[in-house]
């Protein structure tokens, strides 16, 4: 059984796509994507927020290695981490919004709680 979804992409493309999705989610707080991409984005976004809650230098460097925008990382450590200090996981919510018009792919919003 696979530990992650392959999303029909090669490894490098999939990892870069997920890094972009996580960066956009942390920047804007809400993005629209397919349900399967949202589920994979949730895994990594929750890991980044948990690292930010630790707040030490090593955690910041680990997040900087994954998130593509330094201002997003600063926002994550200064604003979002204190907001979720009392919450043990479950930082995101996926809301299904129905099929996409072009190819009927199941779409969803993923947002920070």
Swiss-Prot record:
Gene3D superfamilies: Ribosomal protein L17. Signal peptide: none annotated. GO terms for cellular component: cytosolic large ribosomal subunit. GO terms for molecular function: structural constituent of ribosome. Keywords: Ribonucleoprotein, Ribosomal protein. It comes from the Bacteria. The keyword Heme does not apply. GO terms for biological process: translation. The keyword Ribosomal protein applies. Belongs to the bacterial ribosomal protein bL17 family. Part of the 50S ribosomal subunit. Contacts protein L32. NCBIfam families: L17. PANTHER family: LARGE RIBOSOMAL SUBUNIT PROTEIN BL17M, RIBOSOMAL PROTEIN L17. This is Large ribosomal subunit protein bL17. It comes from Clostridioides difficile (strain 630) (Peptoclostridium difficile).
């Amino acid at each position: 059984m696979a530990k992650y979804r392959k999303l029909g992409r090669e490894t490098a493309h999939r990892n870069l796509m997920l890094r972009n999705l996580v960066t956009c989610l942390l920047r804007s707080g809400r993005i629209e994507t397919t349900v399967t991409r949202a589920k994979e984005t949730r895994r990594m976004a929750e890991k980044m927020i948990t690292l930010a809650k630790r707040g030490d230098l090593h955690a910041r460097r680990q997040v900087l290695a994954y998130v593509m925008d330094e201002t997003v990382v600063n926002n994550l450590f200064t604003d979002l981490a204190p907001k979720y200090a009392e919450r043990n996981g479950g930082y995101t919510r996926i809301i299904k919004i129905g099929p996409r018009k072009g190819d009927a792919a199941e779409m969803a919003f993923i947002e920070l709680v």
